[in-house]
Swiss-Prot record:
The keyword Repressor does not apply. Belongs to the Gram-positive plasmids replication protein type 1 family. Produces a single-strand nick in a specific site of the plasmid, and this nick results in single-strand replication by rolling circle mechanism. Coiled coil: none annotated. GO terms for molecular function: DNA binding. This is Protein rep. InterPro entries: Rep. Keywords: DNA replication, Plasmid. It comes from Streptococcus pneumoniae serotype 2 (strain D39 / NCTC 7466).
């Protein structure tokens, strides 16, 4: 049995840039989410999973003083602030790996960022609309004109809330890698924004012209890879977690229920499989990068959430 020495110290965990990882703030937001689920009458098991998310965090304190998480329970709820922070890090790391490899294999490839939208919908229509959105995306990317110069893509479904109209705006962001020939060929290869709009309207099977945006990913400041990662962020925006806003939480939870928000195609899909990258949405949220230093080098640290003091307190033990 492990014996831990009580330190009664508040957890302090900083990233490589010296910024506080703010475990406490994220935990408090997760507890707020659990309270809202309770207010909305969701089942006890769901509420309990969110309430206990990140209750105990086990780290290795390394020689340089940095902490390495090696064990924790995360609830994996679609709206959980704690889990979405972990997913965001994992997604950024995996996207970086995929893009690095794709550029090595196709150095002349160019990157585009495509946004596909539909009309805003009320909360009760959100789930069905997201299904329609992803099915329409599949139809669009099966078209010969799209496939012709496509090397690979990653797509993400995002939903934003219009507070004034009390509606939701589901849309798809797509990072595309295309052959350089996409930009040549007197109309045979290049697809204008207007043509993307027409093809998206046909794929959606709607009687209105949906908004579409297509642009090249350009090197600005951070270089090409930095611009790509900035463009392809994890598709979850923070939502206001208070009881007055509870219906938005309910609508988003029901709308995203059993929906895959991320998808890969072409070379990106092949690379992801080759690198054996785990599922960002439902997979492990402890290991979010390749920071897998020898775990035996350091001191075991356990940080436990104190519900009364509303903070994480540290206990530690030398490694046997």
């Amino acid at each position: 049995m492990e014996k831990w020495e009580n330190q009664d110290k508040i957890l302090l965990d900083k990233n490589k840039r010296g910024k506080d990882r703010n475990w406490r703030g994220r935990k408090l937001l997760s507890l707020k989410l659990a309270d809202i689920f309770k207010e909305l009458g969701y089942r006890e098991t769901l509420i309990e999973r969110v309430e206990t998310c990140g209750d105990t965090l086990r780290f290795i304190r390394r020689e340089d003083g940095s902490l390495r998480l090696y064990q924790a329970y995360f609830c994996k709820n679609k709206l959980c602030p704690m889990c979405n922070w972990r997913r965001s890090m994992k997604y950024s790391y995996q996207t970086s790996q995929i893009v690095d490899e794709a550029i090595k294999e196709q150095p002349k490839g160019r990157f585009l960022f495509l946004t596909l939208t539909v009309k805003n919908v009320p909360g009760k229509e959100l789930n069905a609309t997201i299904s329609q959105l992803t099915q329409s995306f599949d139809r669009l990317f099966r078209r010969a004109k799209v496939k012709k110069n496509l090397i690979g893509f990653l797509r993400s479904v995002e939903v934003t809330h219009n507070q004034e109209e009390e509606t939701y705006h589901p849309h798809i962001h797509v990072l595309m890698m295309v052959k350089s020939s996409y930009f040549s060929g007197a109309g045979d290869n290049y697809v204008s924004q207007e043509e993307w709009g027409r093809m998206w309207e046909q794929s959606l099977k709607v009687d209105y012209v949906p908004m579409v945006d297509i642009r090249s990913v350009k090197e600005i400041g951070k270089g090409l890879k930095g611009a790509i990662l900035e463009t392809a962020k994890y598709p979850i925006k923070p939502i206001k977690l208070d009881v007055e806003n509870k219906q938005v939480v309910g609508d988003l939870y029901n709308g995203l229920y059993r929906k895959r928000q991320l998808g890969y195609g072409g070379l990106f899909k092949e690379i992801r499989k080759r690198l054996q990258l785990s599922n960002v949405e439902n997979g492990d949220l402890v290991y979010t990068s390749d920071d897998n230093d020898e775990m035996s080098k350091g001191t075991k640290i356990v940080a436990i959430w104190n519900a009364t003091k509303q903070n994480y307190f540290v206990k530690n033990k030398g490694w046997n």
